[in-house]
Amino acid sequence: MSDYQVLLYYKYTTIDDPETFAKEHLAACKEMELKGRILVATEGINGTVSGTVEATNKYMDYMANDARFADMVFKIDAADAHAFKKMHVRPRAEIVSLSLEEDVNPLEVTGTYLEPSEFREALLDEDTVILDARNDYEFDIGHFRGAVRPDIQNFRELPGWIEDNREQLADKKIVTYCTGGIRCEKFSGWLKTAGFDDVSQLHGGIATYGKNEETKGELWDGQMYVFDERIAVPINQVNPTIVGKDYFDGTPCERYINCANPYCNKQILASVENEKKYLRSCSHDCRVHPANLYTKNLSKEEFTERLQAIDETLPEMVQ
């Protein structure tokens, strides 16, 4: 049995004074020795925290004693250690940002909820568009079979992508999904206000689908990206597969790294061998960038040799 747990949760509910709430909530979390990242806004709370089983259970009881969060659903993962290094509770304008001119309130408008078994039926329906509401790098390590991959690197880019592809989506049945459900609450509501009539969402997100006793994560390929030190977690309990491809050679890979150029910081899938071979950098420009955090520890001679091994050279001004 694991000694730690990771809790993923959200709740759209009114928080009148997010700044004060954030300070008090941070103090409570630290007292329980939790670590994680929580966003609070007047529209609600969005968090992921880790801690011992005892501490996380205490936190869930603590939240249940607040009428605003009494019915909040927690997605619980077993863990061997903390999934975060620190504890942050931050007030924000939104708990998930679409940066719309006119914000959408999921308590007033949102897509129809599909439970996991209903969502699985939608996956098998050729007349339904399954739309991934996550970022491209999340999709690349794992996604539902047949899902559409929006070319976005940030959630707030999604409405623009929809507008650019409106013709292909017009008059279609749209079912959207995300990690835990929070992004789809707002995004599906926006779709309805944007003129799409038949809009549904996976209730509880991928995390709930993967733990459902009936679906057992079936029709999910790869792993689910998570925003903590675990990076990715398994979902499909029936017939798991690997869909991630190494950025450098296209071989199967589920290991994410960040480009060593801090001005890039792009997330790429790479094996340990290719990380070393390509100096943990996504391009030649990033490899030779003066701020590169990987190459700064190499002597000029070794740097030159490593570049020559991949048919690259230092820029003249550096030589």
Curated annotation (Swiss-Prot):
Annotated SUPFAM superfamilies: Rhodanese/Cell cycle control phosphatase
Swiss-Prot/TrEMBL catalytic activity: uridine(34) in tRNA + AH2 + O2 = 5-hydroxyuridine(34) in tRNA + A + H2O
GO BP, sorted A to Z: tRNA modification
Molecular-function GO term, any one: oxidoreductase activity, acting on paired donors, with incorporation or reduction of molecular oxygen
Active site (catalytic residues): C178
SMART domains, sorted: RHOD (SM00450)
Domain Rhodanese: 124-218
Family of the protein in this entry: Belongs to the TrhO family.
Name used for this protein in its record: tRNA uridine(34) hydroxylase
Natural source organism: Listeria monocytogenes serotype 4a (strain HCC23)
Native organism taxonomy: Bacteria, Bacillati, Bacillota, Bacilli, Bacillales
Gene (UniProt): trhO
